[in-house]
Design a protein with these regions (language model features):
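C-terminal catalytic histidine-bearing segment of alpha/beta-hydrolase fold enzymes
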Residues: 156-196
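Short beta-strand/loop motif that positions the catalytic acidic residue
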Residues: 125, 130-133
Length: 196
């Protein structure tokens, strides 16, 4: 009897910039098939400035609408999903879905600087979830949020000296050194699955 096993899939949930060439390049580095979720209905959307991208994101329905879109993708691909990485609004959308039973087969979710997580601290993820916050945020104090999430037994950490957007070359807070550090960690995480 032969059993066909679905390949592991990585879900990448973008920030308000959406599916940019930088995200496509990021996804190509992983040894597993990737699915990219963007807050915009168009395949590839580009905004020359973060404020324009943010206004377009709000016009699309904000985090709530994005979380619903992400839920549909998770549910449609739950048999093959093993990893989910989210950035900013994408991290918040993933966090809102992290208690969804459809995420139970994930080996790891890694959420970068999801600022709206602060509004939903009581969520209990059904899969291992790592929360990574920038040290500097305009709207809240990340150190206090991280301390509170840790008290709730969440895997939360603060990246010293970083600003919101440190993983995205289009963001004012981008930091190549920090991006490379985390990219290496994420690649190592998915390499284990690709080798199995």
């Amino acid at each position: 009897v032969s059993v066909t096993v679905s390949p592991p899939v990585l879900l990448i949930v973008t920030d308000v910039f959406g599916n940019t060439p930088a995200i496509a390049s990021f996804a190509r580095q992983f040894p597993v098939p990737c699915l990219i979720a963007s807050p915009f209905s168009g395949e590839k959307t580009q905004y020359p400035a973060e404020t324009l991208a943010y206004h377009a994101f709000i016009a699309e329905g904000g985090v709530g609408a994005y979380a619903e879109h992400v839920a549909q993708l998770i549910e449609a691909n739950q048999s093959s999903l093993r990893y989910a990485f989210g950035f900013s609004a994408g991290a918040s959308a993933l966090w809102l879905n992290s208690a969804n039973p459809a995420m139970a087969k994930l080996q790891q979710a890694v959420l970068f600087y999801g600022s709206r997580i602060r509004d939903y601290r009581d969520v209990q993820p059904v899969c291992p979830t790592r929360l990574i916050f920038a040290e500097q945020e305009a709207a809240f104090e990340p150190a206090k949020l991280v301390a509170d999430l840790r008290q709730r037994n969440q895997d939360a950490e603060l990246v010293k000296g970083s600003k919101h957007g440190f993983m995205n070359p289009y963001s004012a807070g981008f930091c190549l050194k920090t991006q490379e550090l985390f990219l290496k960690e994420l690649l190592n995480l998915t390499q284990i699955s690709a080798a199995a």
